[in-house]
């Protein structure tokens, strides 16, 4: 294990992360809200700590192995998540505890969107901007992690995807170097953010709200600058724009890369991808169920309102954004539970969405269908085909391994919450909301996590990390084998 090289890289990451504090400091200066001091202070603290880690080890540039890569990825999220809590700790408004500061920071960076802060409308603009910007920064990190780094380490949804499944993604000549891949993804991510911000502004948002919500929309984070979330704007146009950009962001970013690289975006190009087709099918099915049941129960006086709310909440929850326009927990009980379960599927591999990813659910479904056929014809040989090509058994085994680990982590976290005194419904939905990086839950955590006890919040922080790091990245560090030389 190249510890000095790892410390050098972490120091460099801290120094680079310190620069992100300048943006909210400028917002504080622009709006004169008096909230700039926490960010300037944090900038110098992180820059100093980063330099202290980097400078003594600057000449240690040994070749890193996969074990070093796992540790660096985990340290990226834990160190930056911890560093991101400093402005919340230093700021007078909001005046929150150490636990709440860490919870808010990790929730933002992992794009979970669960918040402990109430009274968002009264907060300084700089703090509001920082929460949104932290989600956007985390979203970019997620894309680079999922598309460029985890496949190199041999894990993650994209590893299965790019290795075995035919279609546009496998045929795409993604740049081989991580730095070049990250640069290409950065341009796409930034372009989508600008387009989203302009669309929100044209639909009636203020420039501040438009930029802030474009950050959390493209990152599929779900943070808002208002307690009422997207319901604050009460606009069909804004709801529709949010839906469109959430769907785009929940798609595999290598599909976007392939589309841009080919010189034009064509629907047929996306439709060749089996995961994309499955994703759209799931979205349409969920929307129809929600819309028809809302009509049946007369939840809204107008069918247009029912259509708007069903579409928005379906996409928002199932892609794990967690934006709300209405108290969806007050819908007929079946619907919020259905949408909560849909977050277990989440977005596509290589997207900013959370959950287990559509590609894994697709492979699990095909595996289940194969087992049913085997019961009828025990001696027959069946292969799982995706996009016309048969998948080797090791791919199916990898998916089942992930599913088993996911279930284990879920149960352990849920039992941990119940042990702290949380009721069963709230514990189940809180773990679902954090492990799937969704945000809002049901019961005690339907609106916010401010009333959750401190011990439970630390369990949920760990749950967020497990969800964002696709279980195995963090789980492997807990095995004795990893630390043996």
From Swiss-Prot:
Keywords noted in UniProt: Cell inner membrane, Cell membrane, Ion channel, Ion transport, Membrane, Metal-binding, Potassium, Potassium transport, Transmembrane, Transmembrane helix, Transport
Lineage: Bacteria, Pseudomonadati, Pseudomonadota, Gammaproteobacteria, Vibrionales
Name of the protein in its database record: Trk system potassium uptake protein TrkH
MF GO annotations: identical protein binding; potassium channel activity; potassium ion binding; potassium:chloride symporter activity; protein homodimerization activity
Periplasmic side: 30-35, 116-124, 203-205, 225-234, 325-332, 420-421, 442-453
Biological source species: Vibrio parahaemolyticus serotype O3:K6 (strain RIMD 2210633)
Subcellular location: Cell inner membrane
Assigned protein family: Belongs to the TrkH potassium transport family.
Spans traversing the lipid bilayer: 3-29, 36-57, 66-90, 125-150, 178-202, 276-296, 392-419
């Amino acid at each position: 294990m190249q510890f000095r090289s790892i410390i050098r890289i972490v120091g460099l990451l801290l120094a680079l992360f310190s620069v992100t504090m300048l943006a909210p400091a400028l917002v504080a200066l622009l709006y004169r809200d008096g909230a700039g001091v926490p960010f300037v202070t944090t900038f110098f603290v992180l820059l100093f700590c980063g330099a202290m880690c980097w400078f003594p080890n600057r000449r240690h540039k040994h070749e890193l192995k996969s074990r070093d890569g796992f540790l660096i990825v985990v340290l990226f999220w834990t160190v930056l998540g911890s560093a991101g809590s400093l402005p919340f700790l230093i700021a007078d408004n909001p005046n929150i505890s150490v636990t709440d500061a860490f919870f808010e920071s990790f929730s933002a960076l992992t794009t979970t969107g669960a918040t402990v802060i109430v009274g968002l409308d009264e907060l300084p603009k700089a703090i509001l901007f920082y929460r949104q910007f932290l989600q956007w920064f985390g979203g970019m990190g997620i894309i680079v992690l999922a598309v460029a780094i985890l496949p190199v380490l041999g894990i993650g949804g994209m590893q299965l995807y790019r290795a075995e499944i035919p279609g546009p993604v496998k045929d795409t000549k993604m740049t081989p170097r991580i730095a070049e891949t990250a640069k290409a993804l950065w341009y796409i991510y930034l372009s989508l953010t600008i387009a989203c911000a302009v669309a929100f502004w044209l639909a009636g948002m203020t420039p501040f709200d438009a930029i802030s919500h474009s950050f959390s929309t493209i990152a599929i984070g779900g943070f808002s600058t208002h307690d009422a979330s997207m319901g604050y704007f009460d606009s069909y146009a804004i709801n529709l724009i949010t839906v469109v950009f959430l769907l785009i962001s929940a798609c595999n970013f290598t599909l976007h890369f392939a589309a841009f690289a080919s010189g034009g975006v064509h629907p047929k190009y996306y439709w060749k991808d089996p995961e994309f087709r499955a994703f759209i099918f799931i979205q349409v099915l969920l929307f129809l169920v929600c819309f028809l049941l809302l009509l049946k129960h007369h939840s809204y006086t107008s069918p247009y309102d029912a259509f708007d709310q069903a579409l928005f909440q379906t996409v928002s929850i199932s892609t794990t954004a967690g934006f709300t326009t209405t108290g969806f927990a007050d819908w007929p009980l079946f619907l919020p539970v259905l949408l909560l379960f849909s977050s277990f599927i989440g977005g596509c591999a290589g997207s900013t969405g959370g959950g287990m990813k559509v590609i894994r659910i697709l492979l699990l479904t095909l595996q289940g269908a194969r087992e049913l056929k085997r019961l009828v014809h025990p001696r027959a040989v069946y292969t799982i085909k995706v996009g016309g090509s048969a998948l080797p058994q090791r791919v199916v085994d990898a998916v089942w391994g992930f599913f088993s680990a996911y279930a284990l982590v879920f149960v352990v976290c849920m039992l941990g919450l119940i042990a702290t005194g949380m009721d069963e419904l709230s514990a189940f939905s809180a773990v679902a909301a954090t492990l799937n990086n969704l945000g809002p839950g049901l019961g005690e955590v339907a609106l916010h996590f401010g009333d959750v006890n401190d011990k439970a919040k630390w369990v949920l922080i760990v749950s967020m990390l497990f969800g964002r790091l696709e279980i195995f990245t963090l789980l492997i560090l807990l095995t004795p084998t990893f630390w043996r030389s």
